Each structure stands twice: as structure tokens, then as C-alpha cells.
């Protein structure tokens, strides 16, 4: 491993490894199966704090890390064993290259890359109270018209916004929340008074 590679910021490393995995599984025509295997692995990683700490720790040898990653992959019941093997081999490469600390970011970047290939976009919707399924569908259709692709909604309820919505789509944010409108009104009134 070259010293210059160690200086590359982790998000860029995430993207490069994710792209490499995506290119490989696309060639192997197993994108969907590997995507499911990655999702299964991320669920396990998210549920086990000890595993998260292990992945983040630089104090374990490569041999120990390889052994643990192999064991984790063997214990996950992947729907497709071939996809599980691809993921296991990929985890070994990451471990040997001392990038295990970036594992979560790499796998999330892979999921993002797969979504982009399908022209899917994630949108986070924050509302003061839960939206009805009809409202969610109308919102999804409106956003799909804007992005010209499939939109996956991630709903979140935050009563502190009082009303309205906050929509985060990529690097854009549309904030129509009542709390923001009240803050704007407060600032405008302060300007008028002074």
C-alpha cells in the first residue's frame, strides 16, 4: 500500500471501493443478489455494537480481522450463497488493505451506487405528524416528476417543526415547516423595529 493512498479522504475511499465492487458485480450479473447480501451484512453490523467497535478499531491484526469477517459472513444466512461469497471476498480485500474502518461507508456508498444505476433517489421527508399513505403517494409522484426517476421516501416525524414539511433530496432541502416560517417572520419583525 502506498503512502499517498493513505492520504486520500475516507469518503473518496468509500466511493472508489464501492465503485470497484459495483463494477465487479455488474460484470458478474449479480447486482441484486450482492445488494441483498450487503443489506443483510449492514443489518448485522448495525445490531452488534461489539462488531461496530471491532471494525473501527485499528488495534487488531489483519489475520484477526479476516478471521472475524469470515466468521460473520459464515453466520449470516445469505439468500444467495454466491453473493455471500463475493461479499466475503470483498471484505477480505478491504481488510488486507487496512480499510475495514471505512466498511460501513463503503457498503452504504455501494448501495447508493446501485440506486443511482436504477435511477432511484432517496428523499428524507420530515413532518410534524405522520402522513397518510395517500399523502405519501402524492408526494412521491410529485418528486418523481421533478427528478425524472424513482424516489424512495424515508419518512420521519418531528413534532418540533409544528407543521409543514422538510424535504431533503440529494443536496437540496425544501423547508416549508411552520417553525421556519415563524423564525423568518421574527427576523423580519426585528428588522422593521430596528
From Swiss-Prot:
It comes from the Bacteria. Pfam families: OSCP (PF00213). One of its GO terms (cellular component) is plasma membrane. Coiled coil: none annotated. Keywords: ATP synthesis, Cell inner membrane, Cell membrane, CF(1), Hydrogen ion transport, Ion transport, Membrane, Transport. Signal peptide: none annotated. One of its GO terms (molecular function) is proton-transporting ATP synthase activity, rotational mechanism. It is a peripheral membrane protein. It is found in: Cell inner membrane. This is ATP synthase subunit delta. The lineage of its organism: Bacteria, Pseudomonadati, Pseudomonadota, Alphaproteobacteria, Hyphomicrobiales. The gene is atpH.
